C-alpha cells in the first residue's frame, strides 16, 4: 500500500497531461527497444524519426497511462481492472509479458524526468509494477498464454 501511495504522490503531472507523457513513454520504449514497435500494428510502418510527436502514438500512450492510473488507484485491489486487460493483451494483441517489464523501466525514467519521481519513488514504482505484472502473468497462465 505504501508503494502505491508513493507513486500516486507523483502521479499528478502524469494525470495532468496523459497525452504528452504517454507519447514520451511509447517513443522512448520504441527507441530503446525497437522490437516492441512491431507489436503495435498501427505503428509498425512509422519511421523511428517520426515516432516522437506522432498523434496516434501519443493517444495510445495516453490510453496506457490512464489504465495504469486506474490500477494505481486500486492499490492492489485491481483484479476487475486487470482481467479484461490481460484477456485482450494475451488473446488479441499477443503481447509477451516481458514487454510490460520493458515499459515499466521506461516509465520509471520518464516519471523521474517529468514528474519528479525520486529514488524512493522509483523503487516504489518498480515494486508496484512488479505486483501488477505478476498478476497479469497469472491471468495469462489461466488463459493458456505463455507470453
From Swiss-Prot:
Nitrite binds at residue 60. Heme b binds at residue 89. Its EC number is 1.7.-.-, 1.11.1.-. Residues 2-141 form the Globin domain. It is an enzyme of class 1 (oxidoreductase). GO terms for biological process: removal of superoxide radicals. Monomeric heme protein which primary function is to store oxygen and facilitate its diffusion within muscle tissues. Reversibly binds oxygen through a pentacoordinated heme iron and enables its timely and efficient release as needed during periods of heightened demand. Depending on the oxidative conditions of tissues and cells, and in addition to its ability to bind oxygen, it also has a nitrite reductase activity whereby it regulates the production of bioactive nitric oxide. Monomeric. This is Myoglobin. It comes from Thunnus thynnus. The gene is mb.
